[in-house]
Swiss-Prot record:
InterPro entries for this protein: Homeodomain-like_sf, HTH_Psq
Domain of life: Eukaryota
Domain spans labelled HTH psq-type: 516-568
Protein name: Ligand-dependent nuclear receptor corepressor-like protein
Gene3D superfamilies membership: Homeodomain-like
Gene Ontology CC terms, in alphabetical order: nucleus
GO molecular function, one term: histone methyltransferase binding
Main location: nucleus
Length: 602
């Protein structure tokens, strides 16, 4: 009893497990079930390719089939009284063949264009059926097998076996023909035959007799009959013919499409050239500095190596290669106009300098005799300052246009930490010193009160204390220092702060207090690369982060400069003290008085 109960419990557990497995809805089980279904659906093709068609025929017509059928001898009657060829039964394929053989003779008188197209498809199926019959006959002769089955096999089974073998042969030939055509690059009637066979298997007898024709098969047949058995045509002749026909039908649509394609192509060329200009200049700088070789630069920036080699060969010759596009022509013409204006101003400057040189020829002789260098008047200094400002403004204009359109040919400079005693307005002060140095060499011997006026004109942080008379030995020592003017020579910490014992106005050292040194990576970048990055960000071609990654400049500095130039800073910087640009020759001593009043008293 106990054993029986245990067996019943085990059977119940197995049934429960089977039910649970049947009700399992996990994706893994569902995927496995789908895989099994696919394998069952493709059993015929697997059977033919794995087992082989000849072995299947041997199994069907050989002694194995007779041995298997001998097991069912007692199950069926000896005489078949319930079968006749004219009766309808579940094996209607036999009757469909008999009826379909009569259909062409009945409908031969009534033929339409659609029937002609369908007849082409039927001719292809007839070809495949003939090939299958020939293949079967060849196999039977090769294997020495009788084409007729054993008389002990029932008639229904014989007919089914014949149908099955015939279907196998058709599928085998169509599939083998398809693989051969794929290897040869040609398209044959295998696809059409397969579709026709599927349609014949799915449609019933009434649908074949009364239903409409399947036009999809006819379309496929038309394409295949047009292509024929030749090589597959991969050219664009058909598409060009279609486009020509559509353009003949609708010329307005052709014009609109052509214009749209032309605009898109122009925009793409402009954008790609602009992007390529910026990246190309950066790549050339990296290659020249030795940071990257040509292969790595081409991979990193996406520029072909031939293009990089072409530009590198053009750089030493002084002719940087550039992309040809419409935007470049526009920028070149614009910069050419500005260069004309700059040349005109520079010619005026040259005439003025020549006149000054002629005036000061006599004063130079007096300078050599007295061995003294004295400062010019404030009016001549302001003339020179105005000219310098005008020239620098035109230079900035040209540079702002050229750094977008031209590729910089200079090598990448290693950024250095700049330590100076003045704030960001230091370049103006150094420019003033250079101007004073140039004017002092060519100006006449004038009154000593100009020194007081010049000190009042200069900004407070750039005030300079100078000594009295300068001898020939001190002049020689001045010329040894290329960066400093004879006004002052004190290279402590790289600052321009010349102090001497004989100070005339006794400025406090607290007024010229130096700011603290900047720490970290402050200003450790190339200014030309920074200008290029600012231009790319302001034009909307790159974001700040992308420009930082490509050009290698500080993120905060780049963001600040972009906001400063676009005028979106929350707290804009204070305006610098600028001298009015009133012209070349109408600056007088009265202007110095106004500047003096505007500055703080000494």
């Amino acid at each position: 009893m106990d054993k029986g109960r245990e067996r019943m419990a085990a059977a119940a557990a197995a049934a429960a497990a089977a039910a649970a497995a049947a009700q399992c809805r996990s994706p893994r089980c569902a995927a496995e079930r789908r895989g099994f279904r696919r394998e069952l659906d493709s059993w015929r093709h697997r059977l033919m390719h794995c087992v082989g068609f000849e072995s299947i025929l041997e199994g069907l017509y050989g002694p194995r089939l007779r041995r298997d059928l001998s097991l069912f001898e007692d199950c069926e009657p000896e005489e078949l009284t319930d079968w006749s060829m004219d009766e309808k039964c579940s094996f209607c394929n036999l009757q469909r063949e008999a009826v379909s053989d009569c259909i062409p003779s009945l409908d031969s008188s009534q033929s339409t264009p659609t029937e002609e197209l369908s007849s082409q498809g039927q001719s292809n199926t007839d070809k495949i059926e003939c090939q299958a019959e020939n293949y079967l006959n060849a196999l039977f002769r090769k294997k020495d097998l009788p084409q007729n089955c054993d008389p002990n096999i029932p008639l229904v089974a014989q007919e089914l076996m014949k149908k099955m073998i015939r279907q196998f042969a058709i599928e085998y030939i169509s599939k083998s023909g398809k693989t051969q055509e794929n290897r040869n690059g040609s398209i044959g009637p295998s696809i059409v035959c397969k579709s026709i066979q599927m349609n014949q298997a799915e449609n019933s007898l009434q649908e074949e007799q009364e239903g409409p024709l399947d036009l999809t098969v006819n379309r496929m047949q038309e394409q295949n009959t047009q292509q024929g058995d030749g090589v597959l045509d991969l050219s664009t002749k058909k598409t060009s013919i279609k486009s020509e026909e559509s353009s003949i039908c609708d010329p307005s649509s052709e014009n609109s499409v052509a214009g749209r394609l032309h605009r898109n192509r122009e925009d793409y060329v402009e954008r790609s050239a602009e992007f390529a200009d910026g990246l190309l200049s950066k790549a050339l700088k990296d290659i020249q500095s030795g940071a990257l070789d040509i292969n790595k630069a081409g991979i990193l920036y996406g520029i072909p190596q031939k293009t990089l080699l072409l530009h590198l060969e053009a750089l030493p010759a002084g002719k940087p290669a550039s992309f040809k596009n419409k935007t470049r022509d526009f920028h070149d013409s614009y910069s050419y106009k500005d260069s004309k204006e700059t040349c005109a101003v520079l010619q005026k400057v040259a005439l003025w300098a020549r006149a000054q040189a002629e005036r000061t020829e006599k004063s130079k002789l007096n300078l050599l005799e007295t061995s003294e260098i004295k400062f010019p008047t404030a009016s001549t200094y302001l003339h020179q300052l105005t000219l310098q400002k005008m020239v620098t403004q035109f230079k900035e204009k040209n540079e702002s246009l050229q750094y977008e359109t031209s590729n910089p040919t200079v090598q990448l400079k290693i950024p250095q930490l700049r330590v100076s005693s003045v704030s960001k307005s230091q370049p103006d002060g150094s420019g003033l010193l250079d101007v004073m140095y140039q004017v002092s060499k060519t100006s006449s011997v004038l009154e000593g009160s100009a020194l007081q006026k010049l000190k009042n004109i200069l900004p407070k942080q750039n005030k300079i204390e100078c000594s009295g008379p300068v001898t020939h030995s001190s002049v020689d020592s001045y010329f040894l220092h290329g960066d400093l003017s004879p006004l002052c020579l004190n290279s402590k910490n790289g600052t321009v702060d010349g102090t001497s014992e004989n100070t005339e106005d006794g400025l406090d050292r607290k007024d010229s207090k130096q700011p603290r040194k900047k720490r970290g990576r402050y200003r450790q970048y190339d200014h030309e690369i920074m200008e290029e990055a600012i231009a790319m960000v302001m034009s909307g071609k790159m974001s700040v982060s992308k420009a930082q990654g490509i050009y290698g400049v500080p993120h905060s500095t780049l963001e600040y400069k972009v906001k400063e130039r676009s005028g979106t800073l929350k707290t804009p910087p204070k305006k610098k003290l600028r001298l009015p640009d009133t012209g070349l020759y109408n600056m007088t001593d009265s202007g110095t008085g106004s500047c003096k009043n505007s500055s703080k008293p000494v």
